[in-house]
């Protein structure tokens, strides 16, 4: 009986944990997003070789966010971070029309991995402040997301430097986690 009451109490009042893997091509804004969420400010970043990991608490959920470098030479290492991932944040530079196909290919490759089959997908359509940025509907089309039938996904327009859209994305992740 004591365990049951304790379990109910922690379920109602305790923080839920969610492991998030944040990936995308190099220079998409992953590290800027991570530290904007963690610190509430913009930090000077350098290309990530390896990973950054931070805990972001939001709406009674403790997100452990793994930000993994996106240079083409280190993308094969992404698979080492797949295990136990509940949410996948794929960051796309919405202004980089020349590499959107490359983003689509990398995303589709990842989504075929068995270890990520249960992970929800949040796409951050970043750099929306740029004049040539693709809108959500265009990016959704170019990434081929409509073809994803057996996966829960969402595209959120963001601007990491201003912080716009980031918490809307976390709201969506929080909602999806609460349904599980």
From Swiss-Prot:
CDD domains: Arf1_5_like. Keywords: ER-Golgi transport, Golgi apparatus, GTP-binding, Lipoprotein, Myristate, Nucleotide-binding, Protein transport, Transport. It is found in: Golgi apparatus. The keyword Glycoprotein does not apply. InterPro entries: Arf1-5-like, P-loop_NTPase, Small_GTP-bd, Small_GTPase_ARF, Small_GTPase_ARF/SAR. GO terms for biological process: intracellular protein transport; vesicle-mediated transport. A lipid is attached at residue 2 (N-myristoyl glycine). GO terms for molecular function: GTP binding; GTPase activity. Pfam families: Arf (PF00025). GO terms for cellular component: cytoplasm; Golgi apparatus; plasma membrane. It comes from the Eukaryota. GTP binds at residues 24-31, 67-71, 126-129. GTP-binding protein involved in protein trafficking; may modulate vesicle budding and uncoating within the Golgi apparatus. This is ADP-ribosylation factor 5. It comes from Gallus gallus. The gene is ARF5.
